[in-house]
Each structure stands twice: as C-alpha cells, then as structure tokens.
C-alpha cells in the first residue's frame, strides 16, 4: 500500500489497484502538485465539511464516478449535489471491496460556509478516519484538537501510518501533535495541515525531528510512503 501526500491535508492511497483520496483540496492549495482534472479516483474519504477539506470533491467524484464516504450529514449534502455517497457515523465502520473505513471522533467544527450568501450549512460531526487494507491501518486525524481517547485509538488499532495536523490556530499545534503521536503508537507519522495559510505557518521538520524513535517523516507534495 502506498500513501502520497499532496499538500495541506490531501492524501492519495493506492491499494490493490484502487485509488482512494482523503480530503482532496487542490484548487486554492498552494502546496499541491496536481490538478483536479488529473486525479484518478475510485473513492474519496472526507473528514468534515470545511472548504479546505471538501475541496474539489464534487468535480473529482463526477469526473471519475467515484464513491464519496463521509459523515452522515455531509454525505447527504453531497448526494444532493449529484454525487454517489455512502454515509458513516462516528464509531461506525464498514468493509468495502477496497478496504475497511471507520470514523473516529474529532474535536473541531464542520460546516460549508458560503461567503457570498453569508450562510453556514451544518455538515454533522467532524471525524478522523481509520482506513485498513492489506492488513495495515492508516489514520488521518482531520483537523482535530488533541483528545485523550487517542490513547484508546492507539490501543485498539495497530497504526502503521498517521497523518496529524500541526498547524495550530485551527487544529492541534506541534506540541499537542507530539503527544498525539505518542498516544497513537503509530510506526510512522507525517505532519499535515500547515503553512497553507499565514495563521498555520509551522516548521514540519522541527516537529518530525522531535518525535521519539525516528517515526516522523516530512513529505513534500507528490512524495510517498510505502507501508
């Protein structure tokens, strides 16, 4: 299984011939190396409804006839936009032909904000994602704050690779993400959700170097990890 980082919180997983994308925010993502029209996707996994995580989901899903798996309310909203969806709720998981997807809790907001119309559409509880295929598990934490049940997630799951936000301001900062990495017991940790916008400027190398056991890895956009 291969996981490729594409800037901000965008992750592309390749497993058994399937292309699975998490939070494909590409247009407006200054760090990405790929355009929505160039994406090949079978499945899109969404952590929550903010624009920098939904991103180009609708375009990519329609271009590829891809399945979108998201928290219930967000999946319902996207279904109204003509997208093929499967809803999950926090704590719920499901086996698909490409792997198992389970949503964990996450602590932050989730809404679609229309600046022009001055409207905010509630999109349900935000989530983290546990994705398991080929006997290995990847955890994507979304935009979460640090929370103590990360210890339980680490105890119940053998996490090969964790993508943790470090940007601070809107998510965990590096100090809390360092604690999260210890609690999750992940074999490899990649920092995400940093330096895309001025309020979340961080040094990912300093964070990665601070993790015990050499588990931290900084990926530039387009770089991959094999697990």
UniProtKB/Swiss-Prot annotation:
Source species: Bacillus pumilus (strain SAFR-032)
Keywords, alphabetical: Hydrolase
Similarity comment: Belongs to the UPF0173 family.
SMART domains membership: Lactamase_B
Organism domain of life: Bacteria
GO terms of molecular function: hydrolase activity
Pfam families assigned: Lactamase_B_2
Protein name per its UniProtKB record: UPF0173 metal-dependent hydrolase BPUM_2573
PANTHER family, per database record: UPF0173 METAL-DEPENDENT HYDROLASE YTKL
């Amino acid at each position: 299984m291969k996981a490729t980082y594409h800037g901000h919180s965008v992750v592309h997983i390749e497993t058994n011939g399937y292309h699975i994308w998490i939070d494909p925010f590409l247009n407006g993502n200054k760090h990405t190396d790929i355009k929505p029209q160039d994406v090949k996707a079978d499945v899109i996994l969404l952590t929550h409804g903010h624009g920098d995580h939904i991103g180009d989901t609708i375009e990519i899903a329609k271009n590829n006839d891809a399945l979108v798996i998201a928290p219930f309310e967000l999946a319902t909203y996207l279904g109204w936009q003509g997208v093929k969806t499967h809803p999950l709720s926090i704590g719920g998981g499901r086996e698909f032909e490409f792997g198992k997807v389970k949503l964990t809790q996450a602590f932050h907001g989730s809404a679609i904000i229309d600046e022009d119309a001055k409207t905010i559409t509630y999109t349900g509880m935000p989530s983290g994602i546990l994705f398991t295929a080929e006997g290995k598990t990847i955890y994507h934490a979304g935009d979460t704050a640090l929370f103590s049940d990360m210890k339980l997630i680490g105890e119940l799951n053998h996490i090969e690779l964790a993508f943790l936000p470090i940007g601070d301001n809107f998510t965990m900062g590096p100090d809390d993400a360092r604690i999260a990495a210890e609690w999750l017991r992940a074999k490899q940790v990649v920092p995400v959700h940093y330096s895309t916008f001025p309020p979340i400027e961080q040094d990912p190398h300093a964070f990665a170097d601070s993790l015990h056991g050499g588990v931290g890895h900084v990926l530039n956009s387009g770089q991959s990890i094999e697990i």
